[in-house]
Amino acid sequence: MTGITLVQGDITRQSADAIVNAANSSLLGGGGVDGAIHRRGGPAILAECRRLRAGHLGKGLPTGRAVATTAGDLDARWVIHTVGPVWSATEDRSGLLASCYRESLRTADELGARTVAFPAISTGVYRWPMDDAARIAVETVATTKTSVTEIRFVLFDARAYEAFAARLG
């Protein structure tokens, strides 16, 4: 059975088999959690992302998909990069956000990861409303068949933590 836990803090300080990165499609680092993971993880992550871009991901990683790289200097074996959707008030993109969680867990299963740390995908510069993002995240991981034994949501601030806690009941 998969356990779901919540932590308020910095995802780059977590110890897990895999840390999920809310990446942009370029995979070359950016702001928010993406930039923090690249900075703390060191150049090995960026080097592997560049190799992926030079290979089968020449046009970048599509929204809702996931791919793994080394974790570099992080206390993890892998970073699973996933590209969340940008929030839209006029188009329902919730299926793409759910896909980020499902595809990350599928990738974790392929790697043999048992513990996975997730950020609140798309809630930063992509402006997804926190309560809705928490609902989608918790519902998706709770209903996805996986061999992962611990899913840890690592929430940056109290507002995010409270939104996820409300969804876990």
Swiss-Prot record:
A Pfam family assignment: Macro
Gene3D superfamilies: Leucine Aminopeptidase, subunit E, domain 1
Location of the Macro domain: 1-169
Superkingdom per UniProt: Bacteria
Cysteine pairings via disulfide bonds: none
InterPro entries (alphabetical): Macro_dom, Macro_dom-like
Family to which this protein belongs: Belongs to the MacroD-type family.
Protein name (database record): Macro domain-containing protein SCO6450
